[in-house]
Amino acid sequence: MNRRYALSLSGALLASSCMTVLVAVPVARAQQASTAVTSTAASPAAAPRQILLQQARFWLQQQQYDNARQALQNAQRIAPDAPDVLEVEGEYQAAVGNREAAADTLRHLQQVAPASTAVSNLSDLLSERAISQSDLSQIRSLAGSGQNAQAVAGYQKLFHGGKPPRSLAVEYYQTMAGVPTQWDQARAGLAGIVASNPQNYRAQLAFAQALTYNTSTRMEGLTRLKDLQSFQSQAPVEAAAATQSYRQTLSWLPVNPDTQPLMEQWLSAHPNDAALREHMLHPPGGPPDKAGLARQAGYQQLNAGRLSAAEQSFQSALQINSHDADSLGGMGLVSMRQGDTAEAHRYFEEAMAADPKTADRWRPALAGMAVSGDYAAVRQLIAAHQYTEAKQKLATLARQPGQYTGATLMLADLQRSTGQVAAAEQEYRGILSREPNNQLALMGLARVDMAQGNTAEARQLLSRVSPQYASQVGEIEVSGLMAAASQTSDSARKVSILREAMAQAPRDPWVRINLANALQQQGDVAEAGRVMQPILANPVTAQDRQAGILYTYGSGNDAMTRQLLAGLSPADYSPAIRSIAEEMEIKQDLASRLSMVSNPVPLIREALSQPDPTGARGVAVADLFRQRGDMVHARMALRIASTRTIDLSPDQRLSYATEYMKISNPVAAARLLAPLGDGTGSGAGNALLPEQMQTLQQLRMGISVAQSDLLNQRGDQAQAYDHLAPALQADPEATSPKLALARLYNGHGKPGKALEIDLAVLRHNPQDLDARQAAVQAAVNSNHNSLATRLAMDGVQESPMDARAWLAMAVADQADGHGQRTIEDLRRAYDLRLQQVEGTRAASGPVGAHEEALAPPSTNPFQSRGYGHQVELGAPVTGGSYSAEAASPDTSDQMLSSIAGQIHTLRENLAPSIDGGLGFRSRSGEHGMGRLTEANIPIVGRLPLQAGASALTFSITPTMIWSGQLNTGSVYDVPRYGTFMATQAANQCAGHSSCGGLDFLSANHTQRIAAGAGEAGFAPDVQFGNSWVRADVCASPIGFPITNVLGGVEFSPRVGPVTFRVSAERRSITNSVLSYGGLRDPNYNSEVGRYARQVYGHDLTKQWGSEWGGVVTNHFHGQVEATLGNTILYGGGGYAIQTGKNVQRNSEREAGIGANTLVWHNANMLVRIGVSLTYFGYAHNEDFYTYGQGGYFSPQSYYAATVPVRYAGQHKRLDWDVTGSVGYQVFHEHAAPFFPTSSLLQSGANYVASNFVQNALPTDYLSQETVNSAYYPGDSIAGLTGGFNARVGYRFTRNVRLDLSGRYQKAGNWTESGAMISAHYLIMDQ
């Protein structure tokens, strides 16, 4: 429940007028400033300096410090050391928070003019700034709730018995005016302020209102109020308040020849004021003339100290009308001055019963009788929230002669208000045992019984209450129901109780707002709106508007809140309403200025530089950014506000913690609430008021649930349960902890247990749509699709106008494979939610097993479990899509954003699509051998299945590859290709006298050497995939010399938060033209080749073919993936076998571990950083291009450690994703034979290596390798590795998207780069 809902609200004019400073209207008031200056500076002798100082003070009151500084600087140029200039300089420095500079100015002023009034004025101001804001806030709360006597005592304690500081004087005397016994002192104090500064309109208003409180001065007060109404341009706020006070005072007047013209004049200007017209026709209390005159005379005599005459006059008035509240109150004042406390108490009670509307006028008088002595001390303790000491004091007082009833009543009321209901009941019953008909005790005990749900007992007690308390009895019955509702966390029971209360008081706005709030907590937002609709559409009373403001504020409807505030007089502001009005003003002002700056930080600091005793200012600034989706600056505002002072008040802590919860930061909220302890004052922190206690408990339950959910998302269900357990035990009836427990079981891979809990909650309250949604999802997770559909359909039938019912239906329909119906469900949910957000909702509506399911486990059921998250081994840091991690909704409503995202994703998943692109790839290496250039044109078609949960994809990719021409002039390159070693040897032997075994070849002509060419083909592919299995059948490009059938399958089941990934696949190795498409040996059909086959016959034919290469890897891999918050962990390994045509068989083992974490993100961007450790090794080194080699990087051991960094973001239609990595690698390659698959070819190579050098010149060496042996040498290399991969996409329309990508990689002994442009087109618009 919103904290403001729990605050007390005063409906009477007296209570509202005794609060804090009126809120200023946020409009440009330069003209008003000049008008005020002209009025005060009417004397021709007024110096320009005085005018400038008056302007500076005006702008200081408006909190427009730049304008104030300019006016002050102009005055300083005229007379920098004038006392009045120094005084205003100190005022300015104190206002902007520079206390040290203000203290220096005061010291300078004491030196310049030690005897001037400026010294005392500035000293008072700085003393006020040193006052504890939390204490001042508590005192103002007392005044706002009508406890004026206690508030006055609190002020006096705050001022150390001295006079009030100038800035607090008005509110101090205004509060004092509400205490009848101190009214004379208050009038004198306000009169002095007005006399010294006639342009202080707030003081003028307070003085006029105070005069209306007393019958003898009421007419003078009316005259002053009427005069104030004419200052619409100079003081619009005070003028409006004066109008409201004037109207209220008319209803207090008797109808006689003196007052009737005033009423008729009002009605001529306000012809629709039916209440005043009824007052004139049927004045309360019978004939008004004689009674009114007698009452007026009584107050005049009372003010003159003629108590006997005053008593006689009041008795005369009561003989005419025994229910005249003003006369009864007058008799109470007379009795109080005569020292007859009991009689005064009786009269005041009767006065409040006679006219409940003016009851707040006499409650301070009742309290005032006990201001002296021990009772005054008790009230001071209560005002300071020192409830334990106050109760001890009252218990002592009750034992004194004649004090039992009064002290015990006060003690019982205090116990009841602080939640000690049982103790209060005992005290009330003790009073009734002595005084069975004590009306106050009967009503107090009835309140206790109502709060405990003992309705029958409460009504029996109320039946003994005198009829004169009929209105109070009705209020007790309703308030009892409301109290009972507030004490249950069972949302269904709460709604039922409040509906009963609304049936008894259908026009009571506070009953309606409590019911609406309960319905919102239950999730029935539409019904909550219908409950509030009558008072929102047609607010009749000020309390209607007050309740409406609280409701719309709590719903986040700032526009409607401002509209309702515009129709409410500032005189009717309660502390809560005033706080909201200030928040709306702050938001409006800050929003208008934000549009003119690029960096909001200076504005945030300026807005938060003002005192914030209740936390409203910090909440306003943070909430403005939260509503805009700017969580970074929302968090910054809260951090600045909450660390501005160490001594935060309870209101500040509760307000800031509530806002932290709105921006999903339960850790910060918990840290703020820690100093409050349990709220009782027994341990850490002071005792809280009941409404503060309720807010604290609700916040702590919300924090427990939020922290549990956060840890559940991280996969740490054990720690999540530890956070949740206190909430489960503290309130067994609360549903939110139970649903959180179900989510824990769901996250732990036990959807059946989660379903059991959700269903138990749902049976207890079938209207709980949150529980229904959870049950539907749990049923789907448990493969109970028919149950999910039934639950969802029941929800739609019961709540067809609630978006959540259709969201649950969408889950069930998608599980059943009904894609189109799922989109229709989501669209209907979106429309309903949009109506709710915009405020345009159309009005249309066996037990033991359950309890076992609902009961929290006796021990932590999630202990010693792992974590899980999906990630690909060895891949750059990904961690899921950008939208899932950092994208923030364009709208401030999270549900709308979520639904829109689901519709968008499902629409794409359901729409068949076609993709086309053009890609290029280049890999380093020697021309004709390792160098690779590739161009491909992928064409992909996708057909969704099972409501988008699966898809069938067809693709064909025309592909061209080439390696360039072999350098045939190089004696180093030629022997390392195919079988050209023999050809090169033959050519170099030609012309020599003897070549040993090559004499035959030397007699022939030189053989032509040529190699290196391009290949082209097209690769078909058919794929099927869903959330846990993917499979495909494809082929390497058809048209290449060697074509292979390829494919693979991957299973990725998820058990709770842990994902296990197992795959088996057969893929081409695309390192080179040799490994990818295979090569034809040009020497096979040459003269040398034919000669060799002729000589060696069948033995060579078996070991030598016309083609070799086309290598595929048959790979088996397993991996486990986990997550811990924003950190992703993974590890796995595998084994592979490489085969190819006429290529040596090879094998590979590989393993890797890694982690990455989200280090920064905002609404539209994210940065992740990680670390990856990789190992693999092959049995044979086949990274060469002679016959039998594979042409792919295959070290015998490879180790690498890399640090990948990913930056992704989106802006409107543009999105991007860039990953870069850098690291260090070490690998080792063994020596390898030239011809690993042919012993004859290798023996020939050995022969050439050992004999050819005898007949060749040094410049004719076949190659360095042949000098000593026919082996490629091994090698060990260490160095840097790294690269980048970048993609940028742009969506032109809902159906067309274009992507550009590029990459570069340096690893092993190679580098590779690539680029692609591709287009994506959705064929059908779902």
Curated annotation (Swiss-Prot):
Q: Cite the repeat ranges for TPR.
A: 49-82, 291-324, 325-358, 405-438, 557-590, 701-734
Cite the residue spans of the region called Disordered.
841-867
Which domain of life does this protein belong to? Bacteria
The residues forming the signal peptide are 1-30
Asked whether the keyword Iron is assigned, the reply is no
List the keywords (alphabetical). Cell outer membrane, Cellulose biosynthesis, Membrane, Repeat, Signal, TPR repeat
The UniProt entry, under InterPro entries, shows: BCSC_C, Cell_synth_C, CellSynth/LPSAsmb/PSIAsmb, TPR-like_helical_dom_sf, TPR_rpt
Q: In which pathway does it act?
A: Glycan metabolism; bacterial cellulose biosynthesis
According to the UniProt record, one GO cellular component term is: cell outer membrane
The family database entries (Pfam families) matched by this protein are listed as: BCSC_C, TPR_19
Subcellular location(s) of the protein: Cell outer membrane
Protein topology in the membrane = Peripheral membrane protein
One annotated GO biological process: cellulose biosynthetic process
What does the sequence similarity comment in the record state about its family?
Answer: Belongs to the AcsC/BcsC family.
Task: Please describe what this protein does.
Answer: Required for maximal bacterial cellulose synthesis. It may be involved in the formation of a membrane complex for extrusion of the cellulose product.
* Protein's name according to its UniProt entry: Cellulose synthase operon protein C
Q: State the organism of origin.
A: Komagataeibacter sucrofermentans (strain ATCC 700178 / DSM 15973 / CECT 7291 / JCM 9730 / LMG 18788 / BPR 2001)
